[in-house]
């Protein structure tokens, strides 16, 4: 596996790649996108397997993992969408399947819609993001914290710092992961450290503070309407964070007609919890895609 630094908006972005010299160049490349607070390390059980048949890339979104966490950036879906679009066009240079988990799923869908013919497919694993017809505000760390503590108090930098310090404690990270993994076998020290270590970077607290004000982003139904590539929905159906059965119903109402679905007995991060099942489902679906024209 090759690791390297790519630059976006002048900032260093951590990337990994596997399989480029060993696979058929006629098959689409694959770009993997992590969720909030995670990194390329979260694809530890997927890259080695998928790299046997495809050119596989993964990157850390700006603000996360080993990538830069600069002040002054407007963190949110638009930034991460544009980062993925630039990476596909500048680094990969051919049609690419983009797969994302949680927040990374929203960014993957937005990038896939923007890339048009440069996108060979989109894979969403328990993706985040709103629909136009949703009346309730989006859920996530910000919503949970507001309900628990109160919106007014969260404007306090002191309270934000205390919350941040608690959330990055190893015991808190492990407890949170145990809540969203049904099978806890892979909730190990390596996973906990992959989340904790980036939180020690000087800019990490600044990125964390933005989570309370990240804009909702373009509705998923609008992105589905703009998407011209095949779509695969991979569900960890026992995800307690997003009410996966209800969320799945919303996706079924709005997703393109030819969408493929795979439902797994897993939580919020099926790619790491049940990687063998996710890898098999991905490889089966990838084999059905038309060969891209280069």
Regions found by a protein language model. Give the residues of each.
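Conserved HGGG/HGGXW glycine-rich cap/lid loop of the alpha/beta-hydrolase fold
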Residues: 17-66
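Flexible "cap/lid" loop of the alpha/beta hydrolase fold
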Residues: 113, 122-160
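Catalytic active-site module of serine/aspartate enzymes centered on a nucleophile-bearing elbow/loop
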Residues: 256-294
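Active-site loop/oxyanion-hole signature of alpha/beta-hydrolase fold enzymes
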Residues: 6-11, 16-22, 57-99, 103, ...
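Short N-terminal helix/helix-N-cap motif within the alpha/beta-hydrolase-1
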Residues: 38-48, 66-69, 107, 133, ...
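Conserved alpha/beta-hydrolase catalytic His-Asp/Glu region
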Residues: 13, 158-229
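Short glycine-enriched nucleophile-adjacent loop
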Residues: 105-116, 122
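Conserved loop-alpha-helix segment in the C-terminal half of the alpha/beta-hydrolase fold
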Residues: 226-266
